[in-house]
Curated annotation (Swiss-Prot):
Biochemical pathway: Glycan metabolism; N-glycan degradation
EC number in record: 3.2.1.25
Family, similarity comment: Belongs to the glycosyl hydrolase 2 family. Beta-mannosidase B subfamily.
Active-site residues annotated for this sequence: E432
Keywords: Carbohydrate metabolism, Glycoprotein, Glycosidase, Hydrolase, Polysaccharide degradation
Organism: Aspergillus clavatus (strain ATCC 1007 / CBS 513.65 / DSM 816 / NCTC 3887 / NRRL 1 / QM 1276 / 107)
UniProt GO BP: glycoprotein catabolic process; polysaccharide catabolic process
SUPFAM superfamilies cross-referenced by the UniProt entry: (Trans)glycosidases (SSF51445), beta-Galactosidase/glucuronidase domain (SSF49303), Galactose-binding domain-like (SSF49785)
Record-given protein name: Beta-mannosidase B
Keyword Glycoprotein in annotation: yes
Residues in coiled coil: none
Catalytic activity of the protein: Hydrolysis of terminal, non-reducing beta-D-mannose residues in beta-D-mannosides
Top-level taxonomic group: Eukaryota
More about this protein: In contrast to clade A beta-mannosidases, which are likely secreted, clade B proteins appear to be intracellular.
Amino acid sequence: MAALQRFPLSKGWSFKDSEDKSEDAWMPVPVVPSVVQQDLQANNKLKDPYIGFNELETRWVNEKSWTYKTTFQKPAVPAGSAIFLAFDGLDTFATVKLDGNVILESDNMFLAHRLDVTKALEAEGDHSLEIDFDCAFLRAKELRKQDSKHNWASFNGDPSRLSVRKSQYHWGWDWGPVLMTAGIWREVRLEVYTARVADLWTDVQLASDHQNAQITAFAEVESVNSDAHKARFTLSLHGQELGREEVSVSEDGSAKVSFDVKSPSLWWPHGYGDATLYEVSVSLVKDQDEVHQVSKKFGIRTAEVVQQPDKHGKSFFFRVNGVDIFCGGSCWIPADNYLPSVTADRYRKWIELMVHGRQVMIRVWGGGNYEDDSFYDACDELGVLVWQDFMFGCGNYPTWPNLLESIRKESVYNVRRLRHHPSIVVWVGNNEDYQVQESAGLTYDFEDKNPENWLKTDFPARYIYEKILPEVVEEYSPSTFYHPGSPWGDGKTTSDPTVGDMHQWNVWHGTQEKYQIFDTLGGRFNSEFGMEAFPHMSTIDYFVENEADKFPQSHVLDFHNKADGHERRIATYLVENLRTATDLETHVYLTQVVQAETMMFGYRGWRRQWGDERHCGGALLWQLNDCWPTISWAIVDYFLRPKPAFYAVARVLNPIAVGVRREHHDWSVTHAQPPKTSKFELWVASSLQKEVQGTVELRFLSINTGLEVRERIVHENVSIVPNGTTNLIVDGLIDYKVHPEPHVLAVRIWVNGELVARDVDWPQPFKYLDLSNRGLEVKLVSESENEQTLLLSAQKPVKCLVFEEREGVRISDSAIDIVPGDEQRVTIKGMKPGDAPLKYKFLGQ
């Protein structure tokens, strides 16, 4: 009996403008998967849209239809076998012709297709495969015209996008270009087999004492005939077989077995334990011959969202294996506009950065796509929790019957595809669609529980989020929590801070509050918040070609910042807080300081609130990454170069973090006067699961001289509350009559004799401070073939020492505050002897 054979159709393709009938219209495609812009660039028909104003010169592609074709030779077909043509992803309106005959019409980018082409390929020899990709941009506009009664309320992009099941950011977003891709964006192949394992998944039941786990493995088998098959299941850990069992495949194509695992090794998010992965495999056997084999890795763990009434309202936090997890992390957008260009290695580097930054959760945002398997594999292996949105974003989606059916198929396919990943702990119905409902005044009666009524309102999309999607998750991944939207909380106003999750945009957007009070603006789980910053100069040098354009307000820089009102917002936060500059390099740095400070103030306070009966369950900043070289809210740019905010967040998310802050008086109000006194607070946050003892030292250091202006405070043998907050000082007082000199509050904490964390509180705003002549010393103290260690010291307090980010180089820490009497070490990996030292910059330099 022949085993399943795969024949990828990745080479030999050509493509053309569908309307171009000339003989020389066809152009070669280097490799499939691809999208049309990649292929046009490869043929020198399109400039790089990521550079300068080139995006505008590529817009013509958005309004074209494209045809791809190839020929292939029919593979040998053993007796009793069939040939299938499999598409893992077609973007988006695709008509597939085999030897001139239409065999598939697809209108959903997020679906895979498998077609039995045995009869169509009866003839030996070469066969033609042609795919027409109709213009999604124009089709969307036509679909919108056909339903004039629907309220097409939306944020970002053309509202017609709501009619098409395609990545919504392709229509342009407030951080990305308008690039309407089309093409074979995931693998296409031929498969020859008599039978195959169509799906393999597990149900994990973990005993409450974690001493035993029952693993039930399920296989779904597809066969081209009625032959009987056996399914041989194997369970293993780190390559060592733990169990094996063989069963007959039932007439309906199903097979299942159960394994008992004693003293299982659990899957944990990083920082809490090992991300242990078991492997289950199933071999499909006929007459002792293996015809197909599939393996999947999975984790033994429990995960839940805890929502309980408390003094703050109703909690919203994650609990894994019985341990409450403060979910500090980021939101994720697609890593490129050309999705096929994102390799497994590139995905892994992004997730490695998450771990390096001590971030424990990543939110896959609903305007992008259900990511490649390699993305989730990396999260599984490295212990990063995934908050997974369904692909609906910022709009009131129509609910035509054919569209609802497509959405149901899409959600079933993707939940089934991803359900074995232990990293995925929540499925969420949409991004900000309930905010669109509020903004547009659409009907939403939470007390009306009749789904058929929802379809009759001007907010019919509720039917998707509160009926279709929860039903799919319940059927195919019942152990995974489902949340109707982000933000959403029990049908209340999406800005309600007492319930559910919230997107807090009153820093930057909205009322543009001071970032120093960010922590007072949060809710039970802050799943979006952000502050823009320019990327590093090396990234700007990539997309700004002309030196004459390298000034802060240049047209090309404005063009690469898609956020509405970005200039006045950046200007406001700069002018309120810092001494501004007109040269681009300093301007870039100053925006990065503001972003780093904003993230620090938010995260630091919200993590502290975790210890107050889980007042804040987590914080996911907007956003981790970029889809092109740009100016945005990302804390790591398109080229994986971290901005200073990345390091600021990492320090606050240290397993033990110490915090100090004084009361900051608003200096921008009428008749603002210097305060006579300020209160200050001191605390320790810990994610450790056991109590430890520590020593905490607080010093008061003059910014002008570096000397201590008052007696230091030392707390010895402090019992640090596990997985919570230890408040040491809640009513400290600074009397500026007694200590008028501007000074910082510098705190350190030692555990078991090791210095584990620092924090420095500065007078606000920085623009009032003289930060010249700091006496900074950056000394190389050790060097090996691939690593350097720097020793940092200063005679006076230094604010935000930022190192140059260089390709292939990883820095242990940056955006560092340095105070006298506290030397710090920074490790730099990827630096070789003889390499030029990393440049650096600090405030007031």
